[in-house]
UniProtKB/Swiss-Prot annotation:
InterPro entries: Ribosomal_uL22 (IPR001063), Ribosomal_uL22_bac/chlpt-type (IPR005727), Ribosomal_uL22_bac/org-type (IPR047867), Ribosomal_uL22_CS (IPR018260), Ribosomal_uL22_sf (IPR036394). Keywords: Ribonucleoprotein, Ribosomal protein, RNA-binding, rRNA-binding. One of its GO terms (cellular component) is cytosolic large ribosomal subunit. This protein binds specifically to 23S rRNA; its binding is stimulated by other ribosomal proteins, e.g. L4, L17, and L20. It is important during the early stages of 50S assembly. It makes multiple contacts with different domains of the 23S rRNA in the assembled 50S subunit and ribosome. PANTHER family: CHLOROPLAST 50S RIBOSOMAL PROTEIN L22-RELATED, LARGE RIBOSOMAL SUBUNIT PROTEIN UL22M. GO terms for biological process: translation. This is Large ribosomal subunit protein uL22. GO terms for molecular function: rRNA binding; structural constituent of ribosome. Belongs to the universal ribosomal protein uL22 family. It holds the Pfam family Ribosomal_L22. Residues 171-180 have a biased composition (Basic and acidic residues). Coiled coil: none annotated.
């Protein structure tokens, strides 16, 4: 965890009719990403839980922009989690007078977005060029010969079992208990 504090904004959606386990599956896709990337990912995610999570992220971004005056381009999903809400219990009638319980789970989704300064493009470019130059230098340098491998020792010829020639058909029928 870093000790530097960035300006942030919070949004919560409570009593959302989605299981916390299913919401966490979607939340894990967007944690630590920029808000625009997160919304793009959730727009195309096939899970039903992606819609309420996207709404909360959009709400947190709007809170950051309107209440705190933060630049929406620098917003990052810093913290996002789903806690368990109350569970509504229903009954499903079953055979012979039995009843099974249906648990309709709810969750509380919390999103914290932070305005992190954009990473310096020069430093990213310089590291990229340094890597490219290093690979070019490695390609130009004469390649070292790999150490010579020892030739595998010749194995002694394996003793071959003497091949038995098939016996005459009359002998084989005698062995099987047949008669001529």
């Amino acid at each position: 965890m870093t000790t530097t504090e960035f300006p942030s904004a919070v949004a919560k959606a409570r009593f959302v009719r989605v299981s916390p386990r299913k919401a966490r599956r979607v939340i894990d896709l967007v944690r630590g990403r920029s808000v625009t990337d997160a919304l793009d990912i959730l727009r195309w995610a096939p899970q039903a839980a992606s819609e309420p999570v996207a709404k909360v992220i959009a709400s947190a971004a709007a809170n950051a922009q309107n209440n705190n005056g933060l630049d929406p381009a620098t917003l990052v999903v810093a913290t996002v989690y789903a806690d368990e809400g109350p569970t509504a219990k229903r009954i499903r009638p079953r055979a012979q007078g039995r009843a099974f319980r249906i648990r309709k789970r709810t969750s509380h989704i919390t999103v914290v977005v932070e305005s992190r300064p954009a990473k310096d493009q020069r430093s990213a470019k310089s590291s990229r060029t340094r890597r490219a130059e290093a690979s070019k230098a490695a390609a130009k340098a004469p390649a070292k010969k790999a150490p010579a491998k020892k030739a595998p020792a010749k194995k002694a010829p394996a003793k071959t079992a003497a091949k038995k020639t098939p016996a005459k058909t009359s002998e084989t029928s005698d062995a099987k208990g047949g008669s001529d």
